[in-house]
Design a protein with these regions (language model features):
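Blade-level signature of beta-propeller repeat domains, shared across WD40, Kelch, NHL, RCC1
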Residues: 128, 132-198, 204-206
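Entry beta-strands of beta-propeller and related beta-repeat scaffolds
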Residues: 1, 35-42, 93-98, 138-143, ...
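Ankyrin-repeat and related helical/solenoid repeat scaffolds used for protein-protein interactions
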Residues: 97-146
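Structural motif
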Residues: 2-8, 46-63, 101-111, 148-183
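Long, leucine/valine-rich, helix-dominated scaffolding and oligomerization segments
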Residues: 1-33, 42-56, 60-69
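Repeated scaffold domains used in trafficking and secretory/extracellular systems
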Residues: 16-39, 65-94, 123-137
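Short secondary-structure capping micro-motifs at structural edges
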Residues: 83-86, 202-207
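Extended extracellular/luminal ectodomain segments enriched in beta-structured repeat modules
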Residues: 211-212
Length: 213
């Protein structure tokens, strides 16, 4: 249940069939300053890893893989595609882009493009469902859905007879701007191929290793 597609003004083109979430760019919700040339970013995932796509105006789409801090967001349905974001939580003079994806806070470079892919780094892990976030009065504000009364499709055998909470719990979380660097371990896992047929000489999509000791 998911797809990345683009519209050329006349028809839709399917770019990739995976769960995708955020589609944005350096301009965020306000739009890119130079929409004809600025990159477009897209985040998604499959069972192997987080997927990060970038669209260049001339080269088209390129894709990269990042490890997952958690598999709790792997559901093959639409609910987990609502939340992760890339937002500028810095200032106009000092932009600071924060990405949330699969339980990890990521430092995301404003300059990320098909020709300049350096700078993505894990910051810390979290155990929340973060809907969106922004900077406010030198604080970070997160809109969180920490637990849901509805279990949706979470009826796996491993869960046993554990029921959902008596009521949903959603609220705003006000915290310091450096909090994304101070939470859980950045331990993560991922792969480029799992049970795939790989041809001789075939090159995988690039996988992020930088940022871990």
């Amino acid at each position: 249940a998911g797809v990345l597609a683009e519209w050329n003004g006349k028809e839709w083109k399917v770019v990739r069939r995976n769960q995708f979430v955020e589609v944005t760019g350096p301009g965020g919700i306000y739009g890119n300053t130079n929409p004809e040339t600025d990159p477009i970013w897209a985040t998604g995932w499959d069972y192997k890893s987080v997927i990060l796509g970038v669209r260049d105006a001339e080269k088209g789409w390129a894709f990269y893989r990042l490890p997952k801090a958690s598999h709790s967001y792997d559901g093959a349905h639409g609910w987990n595609t609502e939340w992760p974001r890339i937002r500028n939580v810095g200032t106009n003079d000092n932009p600071d882009y924060l990405m949330t994806m699969h339980g990890m806070f990521w430092r995301f470079p404003k300059t990320f493009s098909a020709d300049q892919t350096v700078g993505i780094r894990p910051r810390s892990a979290y155990l929340k469902v973060i809907g969106d976030f922004t900077r406010w009065n030198d604080k970070l504000v997160f809109g969180c859905d920490d637990s849901a009364h509805k279990e949706f499709l979470n009826k796996r055998t491993v869960k046993g007879d554990i029921e959902g909470p008596g009521q949903s719990n959603s609220n705003l979380w006000f915290t310091d701007v450096d909090k994304p660097d101070k939470l859980g371990s950045t331990t993560a896992i991922g792969a480029v191929w799992i049970d795939d047929l790989v041809k001789s000489g075939e090159v995988s999509e690039p996988f992020l290793f930088a940022g871990w000791e």
